[in-house]
Curated annotation (Swiss-Prot):
It holds the Pfam family Ribosomal_S10. It comes from Oleidesulfovibrio alaskensis (strain ATCC BAA-1058 / DSM 17464 / G20). GO terms for biological process: translation. One of its GO terms (molecular function) is structural constituent of ribosome. Involved in the binding of tRNA to the ribosomes. This is Small ribosomal subunit protein uS10. The lineage of its organism: Bacteria, Pseudomonadati, Thermodesulfobacteriota, Desulfovibrionia, Desulfovibrionales. InterPro entries: Ribosomal_uS10, Ribosomal_uS10_CS, Ribosomal_uS10_dom, Ribosomal_uS10_dom_sf. GO terms for cellular component: ribonucleoprotein complex; ribosome. Keywords: Ribonucleoprotein, Ribosomal protein. The keyword Ubl conjugation does not apply.
Length: 105
């Protein structure tokens, strides 16, 4: 078994919808375990909530406002002792649209 130079691969995933984020995490975990690497996580990180308040009307009624929010869900996971086969399989993996992936070796 040839291992990659580092001891782990750290993967940070972000998405607006937690359901597609969990599907992406499940695919990564299955791929890593099928190639013989260990997996630590997924660790749910705090959700960022961006709130926007706007006036409902254009000119009057300052008291009438509407609030919108944007939630960014995040997960962190480590692939422990990855092999070259693990790195190749993760590179070929197609994840759902809307998932932002950051990989650190």
């Amino acid at each position: 078994m040839t291992t990659v130079s580092s001891d782990r691969i750290r993967i940070k995933l972000k998405a607006y919808d937690y359901r597609i984020l969990d599907k992406a995490v499940a695919e990564i975990v299955d791929t890593a375990r099928n190639t013989g690497a260990g997996v630590a996580g997924p660790i749910p990180l705090p959700t960022n909530i961006h709130k926007f308040t706007v006036n409902r009307s254009v000119h009057v009624d300052k008291k009438s406002r509407e609030q919108f929010e944007m939630r960014i869900h995040k997960r962190l996971m480590d692939i422990l002792e990855p092999t070259q086969q693990t790195v190749d399989a993760l590179g070929k993996l197609s994840l759902p649209a809307g998932v932002d992936v950051e990989i650190k070796l």
